[in-house]
Amino acid sequence: METLELQGAKLRYHQVGQGPVLIFIPGANGTGDIFLPLAEQLKDHFTVVAVDRRDYGESELAEPLPDSASNPDSDYRVKRDAQDIAELAKSLSDEPVYILGSSSGSIVAMHVLKDYPEVVKKIAFHEPPINTFLPDSTYWKDKNDDIVHQILTEGLEKGMKTFGETLNIAPIDAKMMSQPADTEEGRIEQYKRTMFWSKFEIRQYTHSDITLDDFTKYSDKITLLNGTDSRGSFPQDVNFYINKETGIPIVDIPGGHLGYIQKPEGFADVLLNMWG
């Protein structure tokens, strides 16, 4: 893996291929390896970069998180993630880059576009579970508060079951999300990673400060992506709302919420039609 030294962290990332830079931002998994099957499909067209977000995988922290980062309204980590991606983009290219964020990674991508538009050539938001600008935002914020409370008091299994039911996660995705790692060490790491995400992201990222105006001023750069196998899920409804209010196009892409793993060839074909 490659390394970028940043304030308070060493950011690790996979890099394959040649051509214009395309950065993938992972969601709850936090690590870029989930994008490697997709990267193989794109490496003849792009320099594909798949990041281990700060606090995840091989990326190393040189300073502890502030205590306030677990506050439900804290934007510390999502803003730090966005700054990391912007600094990575600048280190890799003198030109604006392509960026795709998936799930909570797409919320990070939104903050990159909002705060560092100069690094973005084109950007895609794949099934973002953000609720800030929705008419029923308070309802969804309360639901996420309840989910995190259940995880912390009744256990991860019950809380994640409620999470899947509340967001109407498709069966193809629920099966993959609940699949345990192959080794005991892997299962322990998987548990720690999911608990960290529960404490520091479910509430904070989904209710972070993004508005529809943040999209309209850069609408020519944005594509919304919805999976063909995850119809009816909450993240898809978010994209439909953005589309209705701003006119930014939605493109159907193969697979579900984890389509880049489930159907990497078809996923890549859509990206190449968009950006190739």
Curated annotation (Swiss-Prot):
InterPro entries attached to this UniProt entry:
AB_hydrolase_1, AB_hydrolase_fold, AB_hydrolase_sf
Note the Pfam families from the entry: Abhydrolase_1
Q: Which GO terms describe its cellular component?
A: membrane
* TM segment ranges: none
Write down the superkingdom of origin. Bacteria
- Single GO term (MF): hydrolase activity
Q: Give the enzyme's EC designation.
A: 3.-.-.-
Say if the entry is tagged with keyword Hydrolase.
yes
Give the family from UniProt. Belongs to the AB hydrolase superfamily.
Q: Give the PANTHER family listed for this entry.
A: AB HYDROLASE SUPERFAMILY PROTEIN YCLE, MONOACYLGLYCEROL LIPASE
The protein's name in its UniProt record: Uncharacterized hydrolase SAR2661
> Which organism encodes this protein?
Staphylococcus aureus (strain MRSA252)
The taxonomic lineage of its organism, from the top, reads: Bacteria, Bacillati, Bacillota, Bacilli, Bacillales
